[in-house]
Design a protein with these regions (language model features):
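Exposed acidic/Ser/Thr-rich ligand/metal-binding surfaces
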Residues: 21, 152-388, 446-449, 580-590
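Solvent-exposed residues in well-ordered beta-strands and their adjoining turns
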Residues: 167-169, 395-397, 444-446, 461
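N-terminal Lys/Arg-rich, disordered targeting/topogenic segments
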Residues: 1-5
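Short, aromatic- and glycine-rich surface loops/edge beta-strands on solvent-exposed regions
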Residues: 441, 453-460
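Von Willebrand factor
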Residues: 6-216, 220, 228, 232-233, ...
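Low-complexity, intrinsically disordered segments enriched in Ser/Thr together with acidic residues
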Residues: 432-449
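Polar, glycine-rich mid-to-C-terminal structural blocks
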Residues: 336, 358-366, 372-377, 383-430, ...
């Protein structure tokens, strides 16, 4: 009997002990979880900030340190693998300009654009292209080539074209971006306080969108854009932030998203106000300084600075060639740069000049909804350069390259060479067409030559730093109008459209009359002001608005190109071309 009672007692004690262990374990587990879940609000900036960091330039090269002979160290993405022909693949597109929103917004609001507002590669990225039949390959990049003879709609002369189809062999299901070290460099200068639809340097008298109309400012959209970008980051991504006006400020040190009180950080960002001058050099340098050796040596991460600005630097280094050196220096260290341009007065000329660098790209935005769409479709692609330093060597007795359209390095492409700084991944649609997936070459047929053979040799560097090359032979033996596929036809249509618009801008710029003259950097200037006076008032990168102007001669040209686009829209069955037709209609009725 005693033994039975002892056994029961022991059983009760054991049960109590087990329950106690469970309770204690549960307590400590929850305690640890609570500690783990504690988030850090590491925001450093205040709108009353006084500890500015200035960067002054005592020479044309500035004080920014440009490393010599450095190279980026790229690591491979083990998640990426090559596809079989039966599975859809990721497309490829050129870096640099990724849309033409600034051009469209200027026309929409009745302003005269500058030529860099519309780019070939930016417009191509608004459309999907059939890239042509590609050869069997397991290489990361697999080019395809398509040919066409097309009659010019204005001159009626036959023109010869070839597209380079930008194909990858990465499966859509296997594509995954690397973890990111992202530093946002935010422009908080006074010009960011103006309305999205107005030009800051017009002044109050010319500003057609007054504060009383309560239009959203560039600063408000920029703040919202940062928060939208944060939403795209994962817990194992890192994020930091710098702000600049006439000086530079630390907004937030680089830290893991998972350790950060994101709600608090977002609230701080929405409180940011615009003020002061625009010292891009100071902001970019301070943003670069956040990438210490520990970050740069962590090969699980890619590194990127994202600059959000209206691109009108007027303090520190303002020369575009010198600013370009800073972007190139970072690229050589494996720190790549993206630009997000805000406002109708976003200076595309500045960004177009400094973004044609390995790993760089830029977008212009005009609304929160538009940027949200860009991020949802493109964020993983915009931070993942795949192909660098692409060279195409074109050898033919019968043809030579006359012009290259749609690269981020057009100034280095001519004769027998086509160059591209960077290819980024791009989406494909249900028809296996690739977004922005071509480069168009206009060819010149040599006189008295009957040899139609063309040898095309491609070389490039992948993100691991490995060099690749391949070669193909093709024949161009057609004499009458034809298009090998819809991709090359669409590329020709869009190129002729851009050519007409750029020609119009240059024509109006050179057409000085009694009413106005047009300056290359400033735009249309009323003749009440002398050119030297305007240059003294405005900095080299500051834009004033210009009323939309179309001469009768170009209205007739626009009618012809509009009719051409309407016909090609039907042939291509692409209703997206309606946006270009509508824009031409506005210009015709201007």
């Amino acid at each position: 009997m005693m033994n039975k009672k002892i056994k029961i007692l022991i059983g009760v004690l054991v049960s109590i002990l087990i329950i106690s262990i469970i309770v204690v374990s549960y307590y400590f587990t929850n305690l640890n979880n609570n500690v783990t879940k504690a988030k850090i609000d590491d925001w450093k900036y205040s709108n009353k900030e006084s500890n500015k960091e200035y960067v002054t330039s005592k020479s044309s090269s500035g004080v920014f340190s440009v490393p010599q002979g450095s190279s980026s160290s790229l690591t491979s993405d083990s998640a990426m693998s090559f596809s079989s022909k039966s599975e859809s693949t990721v497309g490829l597109s050129v870096g640099g300009s990724k849309n033409v929103d600034n051009f469209r917004e200027n026309i929409k609001n009745g302003y005269f654009p500058i030529s860099t507002d519309i780019t070939y590669n930016g417009l191509f990225y608004d459309y999907y292209f059939e890239t042509g039949k590609q050869e069997e390959s397991e290489d990361l990049f697999s080019p395809s080539y398509s040919m066409a003879i097309s009659k010019d709609p204005i001159s009626s002369k036959n023109e010869y074209y070839m597209t380079v189809g930008l194909n990858s062999n990465i499966k859509q299901s296997d594509f995954k971006r690397k973890k990111q070290n992202i530093v946002v460099v935010l422009d908080i200068s006074g010009s960011m306080d103006s309305s999205l639809q107005s030009y800051y340097y017009d002044g109050n008298n010319n500003n057609i969108f007054s504060k009383l109309e309560k239009n959203k400012s560039k600063m408000e959209l920029a703040n919202e854009a940062v928060n939208l970008m944060i939403d795209e980051l994962n817990n194992d991504d890192r994020f930091g932030m710098v702000l600049f006006d006439d000086g530079a400020y630390l907004g937030k040190p680089v830290s893991l998203i998972g350790d950060t009180d994101i709600k608090a950080i977002k609230e701080h960002i929405l409180d940011i106000e615009a003020r002061g001058g625009t010292n891009f050099e100071a902001g970019y340098k301070k943003g670069t300084d956040l990438f210490d050796d520990e970050l740069l040596n962590d090969k699980e991460y890619d590194n990127r600075i994202i600059v959000i600005t209206d691109a009108m630097p007027n303090m520190g280094t303002t020369n575009k060639s010198d600013l370009l050196k800073y972007i190139e220096a970072n690229s050589n260290k494996g720190i790549y740069t993206s630009f997000i341009g805000v406002g109708v007065d976003f200076n595309t000329e500045v960004i177009e000049n400094i973004s044609n660098v390995r790993g760089a790209n830029y977008y212009s935005i005009s609304s929160k909804e538009q940027f949200k769409k860009i991020l949802s479709e493109d964020f993983e692609y915009m931070v993942t350069p795949l192909v660098f330093d692409l060279n195409l060597n074109f050898e033919s007795a019968g043809y030579e390259i006359e012009k290259v359209y749609g690269t981020d390095s057009a100034d280095k492409s001519s004769g027998n060479i086509m160059k591209v700084n960077t290819l980024f991944p791009a989406s494909t649609n249900e028809n296996s067409e690739s977004k922005g997936g071509i480069i168009l070459l206009k060819l010149k047929k040599k006189d008295n030559q009957t040899d139609n053979k063309i040898n095309l040799s491609v070389s490039y560097t992948d993100r691991d730093g490995n060099k690749h090359s391949n070669s193909q032979d093709i024949e161009f033996n057609k004499d009458e109008e034809f298009y090998e596929n819809t991709g090359i036809r669409k590329g020709i249509v869009l190129t002729r459209y851009v050519n007409t618009l750029k020609s119009w801008i240059l024509y109006e710029r050179s057409n000085r009359d009694e009413r106005f003259y047009i300056d290359e950097n400033i735009g249309v200037i009323d003749c009440d002001y002398a050119e030297d006076d305007v240059q003294r008032i405005l900095g080299e990168n500051e834009r004033i608005s210009v009323k939309l102007t179309v001469s009768e001669e170009y209205k007739e040209n626009f009618r012809k190109i509009k009719s051409y686009l309407e016909n090609e829209k039907n042939e291509l069955k692409d209703d997206d071309l309606n946006q270009e037709i509508d824009l031409l209609e506005k210009l015709i009725n201007c």
